[in-house]
Regions:
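Topology signature of small-to-medium multi-pass alpha-helical membrane proteins
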Residues: 2-148
Length: 148
């Protein structure tokens, strides 16, 4: 379909919309699983002391911010799959919340001196890069009228 001046009709979405939407949902679903594991006392007991100390000393507000990040990211993936324009808003909230949680982990949690390079890439660099990508892609999809 061709778009009109009002943007009320959708162009045919590129196949990548489905891949990115599903990837965003799975990535953030894994983040929700990670959050649930960090809140489980049995799992915490099995963590290395340094990692457990970070999780146990984290204020409740940071845990809530982390939850907002992964939940909004998963919702953003669903919004992409449903071709809804709210995807970019969800991904923006997710990215901003991730930045706050990551900054807290670096500044107050001393994560850079505790985590291995692999853990830094997984817990700090990965969320920032994927968050930026999902936000960029959802904005691109909206501009191309793949989502309404």
């Amino acid at each position: 379909m061709k778009n009109n001046n009002e943007g009320s009709t959708l162009n045919k979405a590129h196949w990548s919309l489905w891949v990115v939407g599903l990837t965003a949902f799975i990535w953030h679903g894994l983040g929700l699983f990670n959050l649930a594991m960090q809140l489980n006392p049995n799992v915490l007991a099995q963590m290395p002391d340094s990692h457990r100390a970070i999780a146990e000393s984290r204020p409740v507000w940071v845990t809530i911010i982390f939850a907002l990040s992964v939940l909004n990211g998963a919702i953003g993936g669903v919004h992409l799959l449903l071709k809804m324009k709210f995807a970019s808003s969800s991904f923006l909230i997710s990215l901003l919340a991730a930045v706050v949680a990551i900054l807290h982990a670096i500044i107050k949690g001393n994560a850079l001196s505790i985590f291995s390079p692999f853990e830094i890439s997984l817990a700090i660099i990965g969320p920032l890069i994927t968050g930026l990508f999902f936000l960029w892609y959802s904005i691109k999809a909206k501009k191309k009228f793949w989502i309404r």
